[in-house]
């Protein structure tokens, strides 16, 4: 059964504007000039509106979800090791991941999600036939289930990142197809490919875009044909988080591709998201442009795994601290 993502309530722009003005007023009362907080007030206003408050409240329950997987259409391009997923997963489970350590230092809970395993778990709950393999709906449902679980736990802000071989190729294919951009303008160097790898990557993106040329406005079909489970799981998380009124900061080209698909599945879902940065992959900027979203940070880093969201989080927390101090 297809997951329904249509029940999204838009964030009221009037409430965003009012909360922004209130936050600016707190600093004016303390000696600041008009609009002295700049974009910080706008981010705080957005957060307050998502929280249903007049001013943004402290973020005490924040989760970083790193969704990992690969794409069956792009196995030969990435220079990542074949067992990179299990290697990175082990770093997270053993507490030796630098990204996880940085998250914990900011009082952020960390979840590492293997997209295929999560979808397989979802399939088991559906009482599928023996030998059945997870597909698109299981990937989307796994993402939605995670977003529901986080909302039920009281998560106040969700940080999203991606990881996996072939992520940049699959994401560039999706973004190029939806935005109508030629392959050479969305391709990046990904995991550190050489010139020969770049040429192969262009060919794979070109072939992938050709394969979805007739379904450019159908996100489910695009996700199914590109066959990148983690991007589909991210799509489910982003769409369902909006339904559950959980604000999200995302980072990375895989997340950007998922955001495009999620917005198509759940109109106005983008109201609940903020991109952390423009990243380092060329496909991210046109994706954010199509979404009408501006990143919190002016520059990005190429590490992935949501590292950029950990750079952006202090900005939102600073906005809540200004609100608390001026209340």
Task: Kindly label every feature range from the protein language model.
Residues 1-327:
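N-terminal loops that bind phosphate or other acidic moieties
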């Amino acid at each position: 059964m297809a997951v329904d993502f249509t029940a999204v309530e838009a964030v009221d722009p009037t409430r965003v504007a009012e909360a922004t003005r209130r936050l600016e007023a707190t600093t004016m009362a303390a000696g600041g000039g008009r609009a002295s907080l700049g974009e910080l007030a706008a981010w705080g206003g957005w957060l307050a509106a998502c929280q249903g408050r007049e001013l943004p409240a402290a973020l005490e329950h924040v989760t970083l979800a790193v969704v990992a997987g690969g794409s069956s259409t792009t196995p030969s391009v990435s220079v990542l090791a074949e067992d990179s997923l299990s290697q990175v997963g082990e770093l997270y489970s053993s507490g030796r991941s630098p990204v996880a350590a940085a998250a914990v230092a900011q009082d952020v809970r960390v979840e590492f999600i293997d997209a295929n395993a999560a979808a397989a778990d979802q399939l088991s709950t559906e009482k599928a036939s023996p030998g059945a393999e997870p597909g698109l709906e299981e990937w989307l449902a796994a993402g939605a289930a995670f977003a529901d679980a986080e909302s039920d736990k009281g998560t106040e802000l969700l940080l999203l990142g991606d990881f996996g071989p072939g992520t940049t190729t699959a994401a560039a294919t999706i973004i190029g197809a939806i935005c109508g951009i030629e392959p050479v303008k969305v391709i990046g160097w990904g995991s550190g490919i050489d010139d020969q790898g770049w040429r192969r990557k262009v060919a794979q993106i070109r072939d992938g875009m050709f394969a979805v040329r007739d379904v450019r406005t159908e996100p489910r079909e695009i996700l199914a044909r590109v066959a990148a489970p983690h991007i589909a799981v991210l799509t489910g998380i982003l769409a369902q988080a909006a339904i559950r009124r959980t604000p999200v900061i995302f980072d990375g080209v895989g997340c950007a591709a998922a955001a495009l698909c999620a917005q198509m599945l759940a109109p106005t879902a983008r109201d609940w998201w903020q991109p952390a940065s423009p990243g380092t992959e060329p496909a991210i900027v046109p994706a954010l442009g199509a979404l009408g979203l501006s990143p919190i940070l002016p520059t990005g880093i190429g590490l992935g795994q949501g590292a950029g969201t950990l750079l952006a989080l202090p900005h939102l927390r600073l906005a809540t601290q200004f609100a608390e101090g001026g209340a």
